[in-house]
Amino acid sequence: MSSSGYGQSTAGAIFLLISPGARAGGMGEAQIAVANDATASYWNPAGLAFLSGNELSGMHVKWLPGLADDMTYDFLAYNQSLNDFGSIGGHIIYLDAGKQTRTDSEGNIEGTFSTYFTSAALSYSALLTRTSSIGLNAKILYQHLADRATGTEQGNPWSTDFGFDFGYLKRDAFNGLLDFATVLINVGPKISFIDENQADPMPTTLKFGFNLHAVQQQHNKLNIVYDVSKLVVASYAAMDWDGDGWVGGYDESGRGGFVNGVPTETKGYEYNQDGQIETTHSDPIYLAIFTSWVDDWLLGGDRDMENYDRRIGGWDENGNNTFQENQIVDGDTITVTIRNFGDVGYGAYNLDGKLEVGNKNDRSIMNEINTLVHNVGIEYWYNDMFAIRGGYYYDFTGAIASPTFGFGLRFSNFGFDFGYTSAKKDTDPLANTMRYSLSYKF
């Protein structure tokens, strides 16, 4: 989300996208081409290969203080150099979402329960050349929504899952002027709780980063950093892919399943006659890496908006039904001309007045461009002891535009960092969030 965005996502385990480290927090969360401390285990495991010695880094922060007063986020990272055999590391994340109130079906309070999320990752990184490296994370995550299901729900409101991160880093390109990197994080199977049929994809994210060494003097260093990222999750709303005016109605082999002329809700009849799934779904990761760049504008057809009746259109802009012969108006039954999908006069709207027929034409490539999240940061070091930082986090779809500020201190083997997110409280839940990090090299 980095930490703030991706609110538009239909992915699960979004807590994995919360950005750790006060240093990153002060630089607009731009970090994957920097990755030169223990937090590289999170940002880009490829960065660990360039580190010498060992380092331990941690952060504790009160999370989303504008929304809740009992949420906390903790992060701990470690790296260890194996000299000619590369580097190892890892990190632990714990997000405590606080106490929730349990009620019965009639709204009576039954007590409280805890909600929390945690993950642990192991990292390995090795040099490809003197100036390039690759890295890998293997992680396990546990999400605990509640201690038991509610009402008639079957199953458990918690899940245990796994995932992987892959990173590449190139140092000192263009005569030492530029570092650049790419990572693909949170690659893994879908996540489910109560109902496996409603499983959400992992928050798989592709990032590209650049670190420009604008000033490299003995006592003065200035770096300008830029990251751009995209959630590579291809999720589709209920849509009419084949243009027959219906969402689904057939099984995977093309056998029809209509009841009174309307697609059945029975499981297995989510397809059109060509075998394409038309109900809400998402692509598997091996497809989503590619289709996530076009799913919001090029792929799919007219959407079944909001009421999800499986019918595309059928009502005119005044709310008049155009497909039933006998209708009741002011208590009287009247006969009207029946119009089928595609006929002149067939209503383009649904019962709620939302345009459905032809709404696929309203999507454009800008829908995809607007899903990109941009992070810009600047960091000035004096004598490798004191740093001043600034940055900007921009997420168009999530309606987030947040300036960030921070500073860092290094003394002997100890480090302290502070990061501050400045934003309007009504637009960014991270407004006025202050992050503090400590590190120790040994």
Describe each PLM feature range.
Residues 4-442:
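Subset of outer-membrane beta-barrel
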